[in-house]
Amino acid sequence: MDFQDVNNVIESHPDMILKDKYIAIKKVNWLDKVTNIRKISKDLNIGLDSIIFIDDSPFEVNLVRSQLPELKVVKVPSKLHKYTEIMRNILGDFYNLTSSNEDESKTRIYKEQLKRHKIKKTFSNIDEYLSSLCLEISISENSNSIVDRISQISLKTNQFNLTTRRYTETDIFGFIEDTRYCVYSLSVCDKYGDYGSTGLAIILINGGIATIDSFLISCRIIGRYIEFSFIDYIINKMRDNNIEFLNAKYIKTGKNNQTENFYEDCGFDLIETSKTSKIYSLKLEKYTINGKKDYIEVIDE
């Protein structure tokens, strides 16, 4: 299988609608589909549950379906007249009623991630690699201008999502207009490009007690310790508002296991635990700023 032959088909075949500029990554080799899908997930830093596999081979479809149950798998029908039915069934996976600027920039964002992945291989130390990125995070409070993206993050993020509560744009507007709530949105960039709006925290304030309703970051920025800088920022804001205690909850979903001990790692006290959840509280005067990584610059917008 020749890489150039594939490129020629993409660019020259009269029936090929998708051109190279729309394709973030190609795997042209003799490896099995399961291995290549795993590599794509790693290279683009996206979850397997964000990938849809489409193939006309019953063998390949069954192999991927059995080995990667997180994926949505679609078999291309052998009869042309059934194509419309298949497209109708998967339409919701590809189209939103509204789109954000970041939706239109997804291919660029993924190509920038490929550059990072290639550079990462040249470093033997993860801290040196992350420091080389020149990471900047910008945090906005109660921003009306990106409510569409804030809602998208809430609806789509599974892995680093402590409670996995889903909120529509109407819900987010409601939080912003309610003086009891603070909605913090996080955006990240580095020397290779802009990751876009990739984090969300919703805080309920009641007297001297604040409760984290939602805390989540997109999988595309996982592994950079950004979550610690984000929680540091929120805690500082709560201190500025004379909040004495910050309460939080972890709700287990099966997809967010990696976040199970996040609040404990941040110094929260575990108050109550069950098979499906953990409840925490933090006395803010006792909190020591994580400062996990000093290479992350935090900008207050």
Write out the residue ranges for each language-model feature:
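Short, high-confidence coil segments that cap the C-terminus of an alpha-helix
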Residues: I46-L48, R180-Y181, D240-I243
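A conserved beta-strand-loop-helix scaffold within acyl/acetyltransferase catalytic domains
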Residues: F3, S138-R220
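Terminal substrate-recognition subdomain of acyl/acetyltransferases
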Residues: D43, R65, P69-L135, N236-E301
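Short acidic-hydrophobic, aromatic-tinged amphipathic segments that line or gate anion-handling sites
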Residues: I25-N29, V73-V76, S138-E141
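Flexible loop/turn segments at secondary-structure boundaries
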Residues: D2-N7, V34-N36, P58-N62, H81, ...
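Acyl-donor binding region in acyl/amide transferases
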Residues: V188-K191, S197-S277
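Substrate-recognition/cap helix-loop segment adjacent to the acidic, metal-dependent catalytic center
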Residues: M1-V28
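Conserved Lys-Pro-Asp/Glu-containing loop-to-beta segment of HAD-superfamily phosphomonoesterases
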Residues: I37-P58, V64
